[in-house]
Design a protein with these regions (language model features):
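Positively charged n-region of N-terminal signal peptides that target proteins for export
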Residues: 8-17
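Glycine-rich, aromatic-lined ligand/substrate-binding cores of catalytic
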Residues: 241-389
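A contiguous strand-loop segment
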Residues: 33-131, 151-311
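Sec-dependent N-terminal signal peptides
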Residues: 17-26
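Histidine-centered catalytic/metal-binding microenvironments
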Residues: 454-493
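Substrate-recognition/cap regions that form aromatic- and gly/pro-loop-enriched pockets
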Residues: 340-469
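Sec/Tat signal peptide C-region and signal peptidase I cleavage site
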Residues: 28-32
Length: 493
């Protein structure tokens, strides 16, 4: 009896019920994501890399595609909240847009995010734009990271921002930034919010350094007069003063401490993931931040960015997205919850009480509820149609392979299509469902089956890295000869 036996009608009915319950009872876990950032000078091949895991109990993993297009002046675009399909309103469409594959566009711009929520009342329920819509609208309109920051924040100010606090990774082929943003407190006059928009700060990650964020604001103090390296909204400090959130000097203002105060969950469930990345790849002894990552000492914050002890490769940053805190004090293979097969997963809840004691389950980078994940790679030494690659995967990163897709591609594989299956509709040709089946099988005996699955993934990805190098060479030769049609065929890899 094969794996198909677990996908009978009864289990599909159970899945529908479970998904409904998750929507109702697990809203706080709905969008828990991880981003890792590697600058040109910190990578082995001088590419800029951004990773993203879209973690949600209800997100179906697909690769979206927005073809480049031209629109007549005055055309309006309808906006639907990302992941919920709730109609929010409409805004003017740009007269021309860029090709977008996943979270990258044809100019090698990458945008990703992680949600941290922040102060509950700093949300505009009447805003037309949510963070997800803003990401994909910006990707269709911006060429560079700096232009993306300008467009992203201007959209919020002009049309209203209906999401809560977010950390946004924005990178191009030369620079990488973290933008942190939260809404303003609404002020309703005659039924209209006259205080729409957002407060925000963006910091450039210095070349040669790496960074990350995982559902917790990380920008503390920032330079007030250094636009090469830091940009911010004019009212980011004054709005905090108006709300009684801050009363100190401007130069001492900390965005994260003001708009996203730390608590145990933020440190242990969120910052610990960033600590794991730094612990593995950064210079120095990271045990000095264990009390912070453990949720015990909020005063011992980690730096926003770090210098790696050795340059980081594409494969290494991809494998970091498969991290379960192995060989650290948070290693989940070593406690009773791992069972007899060293399972590095804890299903839920993240904490619970037993005999008056609170027990905490770790939240690693790799998790069972990932919808999709990727490593975006921007390569400045190649022309844009060839340089941008999104290495894309679906379901749990620990048991799913990455597929390279050039961001100039004009079509998406049916196996990753949003039209192929859904979270409650099984499709045997859907990559999400295939990877989900493999993951469920691996969870049964993780130290045996999971190890074998990982070996297959490693071999496959190493082969694809070599194939892409050959494909790049072929595409570049065709591109230099001006044979655009053949070049487009080449990047269908």
């Amino acid at each position: 009896m094969g794996l198909n036996c677990i996908f009978n009608d009864n289990l599909l009915i159970m899945k529908r019920l479970l998904i409904s319950l998750l929507i109702i009872f697990n809203v706080s876990y709905a969008f828990a994501c991880t981003n890792l950032i590697v600058t040109k000078g910190a990578s082995t091949d001088s590419s800029v890399m951004v990773t993203y895991a879209a973690d949600s109990h209800t997100r179906y993993g697909t690769l979206v595609h927005y073809p480049a297009a031209r629109y007549a002046p005055g055309t309006m675009m309808q906006v639907y909240e990302w992941g919920k399909d709730r109609y929010l309103g409409e805004i003017p469409q740009a007269t021309s847009t860029y090709n977008v594959v996943g979270n990258m566009n044809e100019h090698q711009l990458i945008i990703a995010e992680s949600t941290w929520g922040g102060i509950e009342y700093l949300t505009d329920p009447n805003g037309i734009l949510d963070y997800g819509s803003m990401i994909y609208i910006t990707l269709q309109r911006a060429k560079t990271a700096r232009e993306a920051i300008e467009i992203f924040t201007s959209l919020a100010d002009e049309y209203g921002y209906c999401s809560s606090g977010e950390s946004i990774s924005i990178a191009d082929k030369n620079e990488a930034w973290i933008l942190e943003i939260t809404g303003k407190k609404p002020k309703i006059v005659d039924g209209i919010n006259v205080n729409k928009g957002a407060v925000w700060v963006a910091v450039r990650i210095p070349d040669g350094y790496s960074s990350g964020h995982a559902n917790c604001a990380r920008i503390t103090t920032f330079p007030l007069n250094d636009p090469e390296n830091c940009l911010y909204s004019t009212d980011v400090i004054s709005h905090a003063r108006e709300l009684g959130l801050y009363s100190g000097k401007d130069e001492d203002f900390s965005f994260a401490d003001t708009y996203c105060p730390l608590d145990f969950s933020a440190m242990r469930g969120c910052e610990a993931r960033v600590w794991s990345f730094f612990n593995r790849h950064a210079e120095g002894d990271w045990s000095k931040y264990l009390d912070f990552a453990s949720g015990e000492n909020p005063k011992n914050r980690m730096p926003l960015y770090v210098k790696p002890k050795a340059k980081i490769s594409l494969k290494e940053v991809a494998d970091m997205m498969r991290d379960h805190f192995e060989d650290t004090p948070f290693d989940m293979r070593n406690d009773i919850g791992a069972g007899g097969h060293e399972l590095p997963y804890r299903w839920r809840p993240m904490s619970y009480e037993v005999d008056g004691y609170t027990v905490t389950n770790e939240r690693a980078i790799a998790t069972q509820q990932t919808g999709f994940w990727f490593v975006g790679q921007s390569r400045s030494w190649l022309p844009d149609p060839i340089g941008g690659i999104i290495w894309f995967g679906v379901d749990d990163a620990g048991t799913s392979p990455l597929t390279p897709v050039y961001t100039s591609s004009e079509a998406i594989s049916w196996h990753y299509s949003i039209e192929n299956g859904s979270m409650i509709e099984y499709s045997e040709t859907s990559m999400f469902w295939l990877c989900n089946r493999i993951a469920q099988f691996a969870y049964l005996r993780y130290n045996q089956i999971g190890k074998e699955v990982r070996g297959v993934i490693d071999e496959l990805e190493r082969r694809r890295i070599k194939e892409i190098a050959n494909s790049d060479s072929t595409a570049l030769a065709i591109y230099k000869n001006g044979e655009l049609k053949n070049h487009k065929e080449c990047v269908k890899y």
